[in-house]
């Protein structure tokens, strides 16, 4: 299970160092193999390969009227491996799609991660908080 936020920096080649607290889990669960794809909210999704296969099967089974969503998720997916330094390479196409330049936020979302441009994430988080809690959380006890 992946959780927590990590402020990270992409190097000049577009590589991101995966926080050490996740590396062992990714090595054990997926032999260091991850799949990166677009998310319609403007970030990237990073899945350990076994979790990607579950997600991929769900997307592939969507009805024909969702064919563009299959293209977005599956057509943009790229398989990458952690290198010996614990880094993954985010392709130029995916970096451009998510507006990633240098400063990024990696969010553990349970079975997978979201990778955001730091400024974009902060702006979207502030906007969400300004709107107040959605009805689904109004009866939730913190």
Curated annotation (Swiss-Prot):
GO biological process, one term: negative regulation of DNA-templated transcription initiation
PROSITE patterns to which the protein is assigned, alphabetical: SPOVT_ABRB
Gene3D superfamilies per UniProt: Transcriptional regulator MraZ domain
CDD domains to which the protein is assigned, alphabetical: MraZ_C (cd16321), MraZ_N (cd16320)
Pfam family, one: MraZ
InterPro entries per record: MraZ, MraZ_C, MraZ_dom, MraZ_N, MraZ_sf, SpoVT-AbrB_dom, SpoVT-AbrB_sf
CC per GO annotation: cytoplasm; nucleoid
Domain SpoVT-AbrB: 5-51, 77-120
One Gene Ontology term of the molecular function aspect: DNA-binding transcription factor activity
Keywords, ordered alphabetically: Cytoplasm, DNA-binding, Repeat, Transcription, Transcription regulation
Localization terms from the record: Cytoplasm, Nucleoid
Family statement: Belongs to the MraZ family.
HAMAP family documented for this protein: MraZ (MF_01008)
Subunit structure of this chain's protein: Forms oligomers.
Name this polypeptide is given: Transcriptional regulator MraZ
